[in-house]
């Protein structure tokens, strides 16, 4: 659970970041989720 604050911050950054379209935003979101799972594997 210690990666939860990091994950929340990343989600806020994604939500506030201007995106060209929703598809690009979704791809970025998936990349960050994969990174979180690889870095903090105990959270998945």
UniProtKB/Swiss-Prot annotation:
Keyword Oxidoreductase: no
Propeptide part(s) removed at maturation, as residue ranges: 20-29
GO cellular component terms attached to this protein's record: extracellular region
InterPro entries given in the database record: T-conotoxin
Keywords associated with the record: Cleavage on pair of basic residues, Disulfide bond, Secreted, Signal, Toxin
Gene Ontology MF terms in the entry: toxin activity
Pfam families: Chi-conotoxin
Modification after translation (UniProt): Contains 2 disulfide bonds that can be either 'C1-C3, C2-C4' or 'C1-C4, C2-C3', since these disulfide connectivities have been observed for conotoxins with cysteine framework V (for examples, see AC P0DQQ7 and AC P81755).
Secretion signal, residue range per the UniProt entry: 1-19
Protein family: Belongs to the conotoxin T superfamily.
The name this protein goes by in its record: Conotoxin Sr5.5
């Amino acid at each position: 659970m210690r990666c939860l604050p990091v994950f929340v911050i990343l989600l806020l950054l994604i939500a506030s970041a201007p995106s060209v379209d929703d598809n690009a935003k979704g791809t970025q979101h998936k990349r960050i989720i994969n990174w979180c799972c690889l870095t903090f594997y105990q959270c998945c």
